[in-house]
């Protein structure tokens, strides 16, 4: 049997971590918001950021999943390459399903006039201008971007252990401090936010090459990772 | 005979310490190998390198004629059951077996079901909630039912009771007879397995001490017991691995094939020749050298 499929099977047995937990959490948060909307009779518009939870969860999920399944898969004599491909395929699949669901819920929200109680949960106001297909794409890109960002970090941990994590975060903090200092020094913060405000759509596009870089880095790191 | 594992000057270093040093051996197809030694001797490290889970610092390593690293032609023929294996938190016994069934190409469903019954494992129980012995049973089931051409067991029965252990030996021998393959077994319970082993590798402090057919080894290890002077003169110039004396009596353990002449001479001098068990032999060989010296001074 194809071993990449074997890796996906390992992940599929863990549907809870991959699919159910994030959706249960988010739908629960949605239900709370909906109840509040009903109680206030929709007099006040609610702009919930609750949909962010599923994106943050994607980042966290791979940290959990990799810590548990990488040693297991290697213990079954699965190649690191197959683990990487199978895990990435699983992430793409889960992201695709979640994006379609988010998109569908957004459409329902639109047609029910914000659930009849001015609750803006799935249909985000700043994406109003984007075509439906574009919206679906953005849901998907942001999600896999979050996933592979987590994948790189968990792979650094896998490859270089606790020391590697330590060095990585120190470097990250130093680097962002320098950047932030430089921005303040040259008085660039306002320009920066103005630029973001005008170009946030480009940020989504930039996530595509970033995601590819994360994926390549994860692969290179995992190729040299060991288990004991 | 077909050599399925060839290891040449294999070394694994952690900083300045060498966990495995200059180890060279070969494994032939269709035999049961025992990889014996004390805790921390380097057995597990060697097994991890054979299965490409760890990388050697230097030396050559070939499994089925190829480098096992990222090589599915090699890895798909292996099954490595280790005591330290971890499982995903949400997994039940059932999940582990289902996954194993889809990954090992030669998986025998019937055998797995039968073993599951023999070891009385609760299918629906989470791996996290299993006792040490049950965890070992899961490993044993995978190791046997995977029918991998090279199956490696590292301390496979930690926490298993005597009944379960003898069940393991029985099933292993039965299945080995029906489906010959190569098995490598590392264990502390040497006496229990010594009759099954066909070839013995002894590792001590990262080095290979012994690489011999079990039969030869058994015929070579003797303790000579008798009056001090007679024992000393008889064993002079022979390969002595242990000696002890109490009063005027002395016992010396030899690792050397004795010819019939030697045996007759020993009998004539009133010396007793006692074959020693493999476990005793390995204890003598791997006891730290300083202890040996203290014994000599006494």
Which residues does each predicted region cover?
Chain B
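Catalytic Walker B motif of ABC-type/P-loop ATPase nucleotide-binding domains
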Residues: 151-155, 160
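Helix-to-loop junction immediately C-terminal to a conserved catalytic motif
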Residues: 51
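C-terminal coupling/interaction segments
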Residues: 248-298
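ABC-family P-loop ATPase nucleotide-binding domains
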Residues: 80-138
């Amino acid at each position: 049997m194809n071993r990449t499929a074997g890796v996906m099977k390992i992940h599929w047995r863990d549907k809870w971590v991959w699919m159910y937990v994030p959706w249960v959490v988010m739908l629960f948060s949605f239900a709370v918001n909906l109840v509040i909307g009903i109680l206030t009779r929709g007099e006040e518009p609610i702009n919930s950021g609750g949909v962010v939870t599923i994106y943050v969860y994607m980042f966290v999920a791979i940290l959990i999943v990799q810590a548990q399944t990488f040693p297991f898969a290697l213990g079954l004599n699965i190649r690191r390459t197959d683990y990487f491909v199978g895990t990435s395929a699983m992430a793409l699949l889960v992201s695709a399903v979640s994006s379609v669901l988010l998109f569908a819920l957004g459409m329902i929200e639109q047609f029910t006039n914000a659930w009849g109680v001015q609750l803006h949960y799935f249909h985000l106001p700043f994406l109003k201008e984007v075509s439906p297909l574009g919206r679906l794409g953005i849901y998907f890109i942001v999600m896999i971007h979050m996933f592979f960002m987590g994948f790189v970090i968990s792979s650094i941990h896998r490859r270089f252990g606790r020391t590697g994590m330590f060095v990585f975060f120190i470097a990250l903090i130093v680097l962002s401090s320098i950047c932030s200092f430089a921005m303040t020094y040259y008085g660039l913060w306002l320009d920066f936010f103005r630029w973001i405000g005008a170009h946030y759509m480009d940020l989504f596009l930039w996530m595509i090459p970033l995601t590819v870089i994360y994926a390549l880095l994860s692969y290179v790191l995992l190729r040299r990772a060991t288990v004991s | 005979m077909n050599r399925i594992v060839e290891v040449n000057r294999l070394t694994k270093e952690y900083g300045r310490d060498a966990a495995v040093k200059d180890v060279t051996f070969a494994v032939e197809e269709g035999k049961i190998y025992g990889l014996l030694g004390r805790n921390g001797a380097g057995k597990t490290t060697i097994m991890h390198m054979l299965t490409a889970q760890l990388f050697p610092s230097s030396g050559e390593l070939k499994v089925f004629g190829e480098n096992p690293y990222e090589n599915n032609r090699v890895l798909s023929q292996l099954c490595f059951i280790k005591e330290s294996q971890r499982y995903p938190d949400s997994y039940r016994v059932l999940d582990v077996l289902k996954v194993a069934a889809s990954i090992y190409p030669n998986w025998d469903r019937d055998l797995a079901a039968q073993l599951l019954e023999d070891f009385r494992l609760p299918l629906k129980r989470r791996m996290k909630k299993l006792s040490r012995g049950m965890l070992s049973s899961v490993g044993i089931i995978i190791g046997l039912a995977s029918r991998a051409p090279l199956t490696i067991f590292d301390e496979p029965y930690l926490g298993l009771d005597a009944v379960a252990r003898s069940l393991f030996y029985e099933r292993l021998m039965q299945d080995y007879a029906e489906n010959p393959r190569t098995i490598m077994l590392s264990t502390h319970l040497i006496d229990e397995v010594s009759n099954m082993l066909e070839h013995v590798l002894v590792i001590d402090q990262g080095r290979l001490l012994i690489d011999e057919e079990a039969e030869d080894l058994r015929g070579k290890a003797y303790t000579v017991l008798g009056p001090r002077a007679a024992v000393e003169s008889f064993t002079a110039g022979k390969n002595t691995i242990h000696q002890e004396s109490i009063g005027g009596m002395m016992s010396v353990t030899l690792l050397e094939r004795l010819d019939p002449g030697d045996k007759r001479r020993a009998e004539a001098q009133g010396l007793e020749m006692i074959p020693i068990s493999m476990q005793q032999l390995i204890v003598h060989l791997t006891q730290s050298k300083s202890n040996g010296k203290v014994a000599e001074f006494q």
